Structure formats: structure tokens, C-alpha cells
Amino acid sequence: MHISRLALDHYRSWDHCVLDFEPGINILQGSNGLGKTNIVEAVEVLSTGSSHRTSSSLPLVEKGHPSATVRANVEDAGEQRTYEITIAARGANRARVDGGKSQYMRDIVGWVPSVSFTPEDQRLVSGDPATRRNFLNQAASLLLPRYAQSLQQFTHVAKQRAALLKQLSDGSGIDPEYGRQAVLSGLEVWTGQFIALGVQLTKDRNDVIGLLREPFTRIYASLAGEEEQADLVYEPSFDEVLLFDEPAAEISRHFQRIYPGEVARGQNLIGPQRDDLTLRLNDMPAREFASNGEMWTMALALKMALYEVVSAQRDVKPIVILDDVFAQLDESRRGQILDFARRQDQVLITVAAASDIPQGEAHVIDVAALRAQSQETDGDIAAMAAMLAAGRGAQSQGIEAES
């Protein structure tokens, strides 16, 4: 599988952009600030339904525009399909396949699988739990067809439940006629949905970690040395899911115990939104004891493990994205990731300096030239629009004169 053409409209810093890719290694080279990371991020969003750089759609849309569009011609097994997503600054994101009917973007998540390696990957080990939850969500979205929809539903339910807790906390928005009892009745309904969806997300995440654990341990040992033992440990907020065959009743009782604290704080105190994933090295938490080099290697092994699992589960090689990673890695790790990349169907690499371009055959894209071409196209479009407007104005004046 590979992307042959990518087109962006109003995506971050790109007003309009069209570029062609080749199978194998593609290198986007240009100085910082030209928008090369935005290009590969657009592929990530098309693939996983989200970006590792932001949890909101708003930053993905060029300022002053209501939406951004990403289109990709994708070739796989001799067939070509066109995938299009429309990212709304406000509201639901939509998608089309081959110009067909509009559907939710979540419905095509994972159809063009990709795995990204970025300078922020070390934060998968050293960063906060939200970084690791984002990784879990992207991984599960690639591996489990229903996951993206379940996550979106859970996020909506969690917001509704939190809003009711806040009302109970500060008394705001409580109807004077029906009062507190109506809010409590609503809270009971939303809590039931919160538990049901949360249990499913927890099971899905546990399944995904189960798939990743063996290849992660094996790949880390091959990168760092056989004597090193790395492991993944899931730490779900709903730990009842792993302890009981029927966890919903136990979780409901848990909510009853913490109800005063939730009302006092006005927020959901337990649930998948508080999950974590611990990476352990030699039976110790890596974020506390591993060196920077070991953290980089663990993050690299985790992404390679995800690639291996997605490839096996989907029977297709995901597109590999290497976003500005060569400047961050030492010579040994750079060689390891290059060896991995050269075996894939398509790799998109961003580099700032020509000296960072890896040796070997590659399709190199000059991002500065691409930016100049994009601006020239924008100017032509603006000039054409002005001419059309002037023509309409002259035509209107002529009609008025005749009358």
C-alpha cells in the first residue's frame, strides 16, 4: 500500500498543497517553519482519526476557515482509491471514499494504516498518562474497527456526566421547579452509559496491550541487547474489568463510594479517561529509572511493535512516517530505524537539513519549492476570482445602463 498523491486545503499552514509520492522512501526536506510536519501529520489524521500533536480538531484548520480537507489517492494491490476527510473547526468531521456518500470520519479510520515516529515519542515513556492514552487510542483505532466510534461515544457521555456533577457541585443551571432530583436522575442515566462504554474501552485497550506485549519485549531485546527485559503493564482506572467476570455492578458500587468526592470536585474521578500504560525495564518503571537512551529505544520498540501487529492483523504494511527523528537519534539508533524503514512499502521522512537525508535511493521533495508553488497557485486563484468579480460588476453596470 502507498499514497500516490496527497492534496491539502486549509490544513494548518497550508492554504492549498498538492504533492506526489512514490513507493519506497520519500523525503520532505526543508527548513523549520515551512510546514513539512503538517504534511505528514495530515496522513496520520487520515489514518488514525487523530494527531499526536493535539487532541482537538481546531488547530488542524487554517485560521479563518471553517474546515480543512485532506485527500489521498491510495494504491493497494493494483487498485486505486481516493480517501477524503473534512476536518471541521467546530462540529463533526466527515469522510468520503471515491467521491461516495458522506460518512463520519471515524468510519474510515484504519483503512489507510500508518505508524508515526516523532521527536515526542520519548514522552511515551517519560511523559504524562495522557500521552500514553493517546497512543493506546490510535493503536486501538487501527486494530479494532469499532473502537473509534466507542471512544467518541464515551467522550460525549463523559462530558455530559461531568456537566451534571458540576451542576451538583456549584448549583449552577439547576431548574428551580424540578431541582436537584432531576439532576440526580439524569446523572444515574449518564452513569449507566459511562460504565457500559467504559468497560468496553477498557477491554479493548487490554486486548491491544496483549497484542503489543510480546513483540515489544522481543524488539526491545533485539535493539538493546538480549539481557534487557522490557514489558508493558496496563493500569486501568476500571481495574474491576480485569478482576471480575461481570464488572459493571462492582464499578457501580465504586461510583457510589466516591459520589461525595465527585460532587465536591465536579468531575469524573474514575474511568478510561484516567487510564495509564506503564513501560517497565528490568521490572522497574522506566520513566523513573531508565536513561534517555533507553527511553528512546523503548519508544522505538513500541512503535515497531505496533507496526508489526497492525501489519499482521490487517495483512498490509502500514505507511511509515519518520518526522524529524534523525536529528534526535544517535548513529546507532538512526541505523536501526533506517534498516527498519527500508523494508517497508512506503516511508515518509521529514528532515530540516540536507545533511540529514539518509543515504540510498529516495524520492526527495523540496518543501520550499512546494511552498512557493502553493503560494503562486493561491495568487492565480485570487487573481481569477478578482477578474470574475470585475466581470460580473461590469456586466451589472451594462444592464443598468440599458435599462
Curated annotation (Swiss-Prot):
GO biological process: DNA replication; DNA synthesis involved in DNA repair; double-strand break repair; SOS response
Record key words, sorted: ATP-binding, Cytoplasm, DNA damage, DNA repair, DNA replication, DNA-binding, Nucleotide-binding, SOS response
Metal-binding in keyword set: no
Annotated ATP binding sites: G30, S31, N32, G33, L34, G35, K36, T37
Coiled-coil positions: none
Molecular function in Gene Ontology: ATP binding; single-stranded DNA binding
Chief location of this protein within or outside the cell: cytoplasm
Alphabetized InterPro entries for the sequence: DNA-binding_RecF (IPR001238), DNA-binding_RecF_CS (IPR018078), P-loop_NTPase (IPR027417), RecF/RecN/SMC_N (IPR003395), RecF_2 (IPR042174)
Pfam families attached to this UniProt entry: SMC_N (PF02463)
Compartments reported by the entry: Cytoplasm
Family affiliation: Belongs to the RecF family.
The name this protein goes by in its record: DNA replication and repair protein RecF
Lineage of source species: Bacteria, Bacillati, Actinomycetota, Actinomycetes, Bifidobacteriales
